Every structure is written in C-alpha cells, then in structure tokens.
Amino acid sequence: MTVKGYVTMRLILTACLSLLCTFGTARPGAAELSTAEVKQLALEAILENPEIIRQAIDLLRQNDKAAAAVKSQALLQNERARLERDPNAPLLGNLDGDVTIVEFFDYNCPYCKRATAELNTLLAQDANVRVVLREWPILGEASVYATRASLAARKQNKYAKFHQALMAAKGRLAPANVMAIAKAIGLDTPRLQADMQGPEIDQHIETSMQLAQALNFSGTPAYVIGSALAPGMVSADDLQDMVTQARDAQ
C-alpha cells in the first residue's frame, strides 16, 4: 500500500469510528476497553454493516469539500485585489461596474467559446457589470500562442475586437489561424508578433496559473463572481443570478 493509500485508509477508519459512536454501537464501559478491543469492535461493526464504509467516505468528502470552501473564501479575500484590479488584465463591459466577473479561459476550449456568447448576452442585458479576463492557456502550445497574440493586441487598442474574433472562430486555433484573424481585423501583424514576447504577457499567464491553482480550478471556463466560484460553463441566466447575489451582498 502506498503512503497516500495508507493515510486514506486511516482517515476512513477514523471516520468509521466516528460514525459508530454516532450510531451508538459502543458498549457500556467502552471507555475502559483497550485500543485493540475498540478496533475489534469497530471491525465487527463494519463487517456487519458494510454501508458504514460508504458513509465514512461520504463524510470524508464532505469534510474535504467544506475545508476547501473555507480555504477558497480566505483566498478570495486575500487575493481580491489581484483578481479584480490587476492592471495587467484586460477588461470588458462597464469599467466602473458595481459587480466584477473574473473569467478564466482558453481560446481552444470549445466550452469557452460557447461561454463567451453567454457572457456577451449578460453584458447586453446588464450594463453595470465589469469583466476581468484571465487568459489561462492550458490546452497546449497553440493556446499559449493565441493568448500571447491577444494580449499583445492591447498595445494596438484592439484587444476586445481580437478576443471576440478568436472566440468566434470555428475549430482549433493554430498560429496561422491566429495571425490570419489578426490581419483580418486590422492588426499590424509584424508589430503584434514582436509584442507577443513582452514580459507583461509572461506575467499575466503566470498570475493566471497561480490564481487558478489556488482556487482549485481544474479546467476552463471558470468564474469568480463576488464570493462565488463557478467552475465550468455558466448560462447567461445563471450568470445574472450570481451577479444579482453579489450585488445584493454589497
């Protein structure tokens, strides 16, 4: 058994003992039993009631989920400024909006492309939402290339237009596709390619990686809205509900 497996088994057995006490299986005078006798009683109870194992695993998962939620909320408070006010992150919507959505995305993520349409719908119906875009290229070198190109477009004041065009593109974005789209929307592509190597782009990607890992995001898209974390695609209606909750909590 691996060290991780041993630790997991110990945690399960501990949870089982906790459940056994809850179910009242301990005998009168159990406080006087030896450790070996307590373990034997626990084993007998588990053999008679195998369902205890499943309940113990569920209990561990609930505890882990609760601990992760507490950790995430603490991190949100500590990282609020970096999440919502990073000058190195592009913005959409109302720059003075009363609620900020932070979106983590990858240009080669099909769900992100669909999510962009949902976010655009929200922005069309709620004029008081501010969006921070955290480019998180996790789907290979082509995604990194697309991210570098889009962030470099900020120097030509065409980020939003380029971002929307990249998200509207069908299929996987290879470097040639990215440059073709850049040229089509009027970007100076030689300048764009030179700007793609800027240190601020490296910093944006690194910050996105750090924040996503700290928030336990495992894929794209993912959102932070107020105190809520939303991994996965979210519909415009659900985004609006989360925005309303964040607004009401202010």
Give the location of each predicted region:
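N-terminal targeting signals for export/organelle localization
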Residues: T2-V3, V7, A15, C21, ...
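Structural alpha/beta surface segment adjacent to cysteine/selenocysteine redox centers
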Residues: L41, V102, Y107, K113-K183, ...
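A short structural micro-motif
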Residues: Q62-N63, A169-R172, A184, P199-D202
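Short clusters of hydrophobic/aromatic residues that line enzyme substrate/ligand-binding pockets
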Residues: L92, L173, A230
